[in-house]
Each structure stands twice: as C-alpha cells, then as structure tokens.
C-alpha cells in the first residue's frame, strides 16, 4: 500500500467523531420512542437544547440505520352506523377542528381491533376488542375512553360521563362531535348532553373526513402498536392500548404543538 494512502486512512480512523454526542442522544430517543422518525427526533433534540437542522438529523438517522419500518395491514373499518334508530344532529363542527380553547370541542368514535385466542378445543379463533375514546380537539389529548369485548352502550356512556366531568369547567359552551353511529343516536346519549347544555354535532352520513382528527388518531395508534403485531389475549391487547394512550397523551410530541405532547402543551398554556 502506498504510504500516502496509508496515512490518509490512518487520519480518517484517528479523527474524532464530531457527532458522537448527538448520535448517542438520537439512539437514546429512539430507544424510548421506537416509532419516532427524523422529524420527531429533531423536535425532541430541540426540546433538549440541541441546535441542529432537520437534514443533519435525517443524515445521522440514515447513518445509524434507524429509519422507521412501517407496517400496513388492511382491515375492514368498523362501521357503527345501523340506520336511523334515533335522532341525528346537524354538523356543528363542519371540519373546523382547530380551537385555542381547552375542552370546548370534543370528538369521539369507535374502532375495533382483532386478537387471537385458542379455545377449549385447541382451535385458534379470532376475537375483537372495541375502543371508544373522547378527544379534545384543542390539543388532541384523549380525555376519556372505554375498552370492551363488544360494542356496548354502557361503555360509551361511561366514557361520556368521564368526558363531561373532565370538561365541566370549560368557560364556553361545549360541543361533542361524533359520526351517526347507533350509540350517538340513543336517546339517553343526546339527553345527557342536553342536561349539561352541551351541543351535539354529527358528521354527515358515510363521511369520515368530517371526523378526520379521530380517524387520524386511530391510524397512528394502529400503526405504532397494532399493525405487524399479533396479540394473543384480550388482556394483552387492552394493556397495550392503555399504555399507548398514556404515552400518546404525556410523551408523544407533535410539530403542530410546538414539539410538545398534548399534556405538556395543555399545562404550558394553562400557566401562561
């Protein structure tokens, strides 16, 4: 080997890595947030006081082989619409999802998950779990939810009661939005909202864009803990969802919230 070539590579090997600290911090962030891409890692670094641009973060992530691998698995969307079984409400939200007032605009929906269990005959059977969350459009925080093994009016009403309680001190009249699912048409549901002077709002029939904020949450939830993972019991899946909702509310940062989590954003602006 020519001496010049040897000296060149020796200098390369002896060179101190100027990005060592950043790389270690990025590895730490990804360890705690396995689904963070370069944008959220950039936001987390910014929150920690590092001055770095997005392109450099992206370059380091590629160097370390930390690109997020996305899983997709098509599944039939749960449809809670059973026809007109009660009264429907007009669409008061009209896709105006943004608000700078906490607890003023709340939305809800139901989604289903599948898990697999071996029955008494030793046969693998598919079972379902249902999630009914209520979200504050102010910061995307899940303020209440219920989880059940079958669609249940009781579980939806339980989650509704908690959402009503959490938002009780709102200085403005509240609006609770949903699709036209059977549970939201129930007389007991609309009556409870009227008792609290809460406006009821519903999406137009078969128009998921009228509740896209909740559809987006369901997509993120399933992308990060469901697609590509097999759950073998109701309890295992339920615990995973509960853990994720806590993480989503308290730790998962969003660019639109200034790289804060929903809870961090709410607390910051409550103290301003």
Identify what each model region corresponds to.
Residues 70-74, 176-180, 194-213, 229-232:
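RNase H-like polynucleotidyl transferase catalytic core
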Residues 95-143, 150:
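An active-site-proximal beta-strand-loop segment
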Residues 127-128, 146-169:
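Active-site beta-loop-alpha junctions of metal-dependent nucleic acid enzymes
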Residues 3-101, 207, 261-269:
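Basic, flexible linker segments flanking DNA-binding modules
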Residues 1-5, 21, 155, 159, ...:
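Generic alpha-helical secondary structure signal
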Residues 187, 194, 220-272:
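C-terminal domain-tail junction helix/linker
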Residues 170-186, 204, 260-261:
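Acidic/histidine-rich, metal-coordinating catalytic segments
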Residues 6, 26, 41, 57, ...:
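Mobile genetic element proteins and their domesticated derivatives, centered on retroelements
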